[in-house]
Amino acid sequence: MRQLSTTALVLFLFFYCSISTAWSLPYFAYRKRIPEPLLNKPRSRHARSIEDLDGLKEWLSNQQPLRGAVMAPPSEDNKRTVTVKGGANNEPTISDVLPKTRGINIYASLTRQFETVERRLKDQTQNVTVLAPRNSAIQDLPHKPWENPDDYEKFGEMNAYEGDKGQDRAKRNLERFVSAHVVAQSPWREGEEAETLGGDKLTWRKDGDRIYIEPERIRVESIAEQVSNGEVWVIDGVIN
């Protein structure tokens, strides 16, 4: 009986020491540490001010399409007046609402680069219809908005947009791109041919419950804004 008690005591001490040792192990010291660069991951940058074409190119290259920003089909319910302070009559203009319209911030930023376009979007005496491409439509272009395949063919890929003359070509191309999406009238009736600020002739037609810009048959996702000097139509494509 005494021998059994001694054996039990020895076993108890053995297990007690084993458990105590296990609890004292520096377990957390052996876990893999997260690399410092991941711990201090930089935050994404917000929209920056664009002062020249090089800055604009860099900014455009870093833009990503908005995810999940699905627009409703065009209808009377989609037309709305935005209550923001605007021009001389204290009514909002296209220039006021364009930067606030969801999913088109790339095109909205481009309009502010050209005084003639921006002035027209502020003008309360001349209505316009802005065909604003979605961010994803601009991102999906096979080339940048300031690029023209004819320039590459004529001047070569290395020289097309280099130097002062190249920069001037890029600016002209970009202004042409922006102007091609501003129709110089509103209201704009179905089947009525209208001219853009870039000189293009466009019409629109309804097919079922959808609106298409002709002749390129670009779908209108929504009539997003209706203000004192016109409307903003969000389109799923670009005017070439």
Curated annotation (Swiss-Prot):
The keyword Transport does not apply. Gene3D superfamilies: FAS1 domain. Residues 91-239 form the FAS1 domain. Keywords: Signal, Vacuole. It comes from the Eukaryota. Residues 1-24 form the signal peptide. The keyword Transcription regulation does not apply. It is found in: Vacuole. Pfam families: Fasciclin (PF02469). One of its GO terms (cellular component) is vacuole. This is FAS1 domain-containing protein AN1527. It comes from Emericella nidulans (strain FGSC A4 / ATCC 38163 / CBS 112.46 / NRRL 194 / M139). The lineage of its organism: Eukaryota, Fungi, Dikarya, Ascomycota, Pezizomycotina.
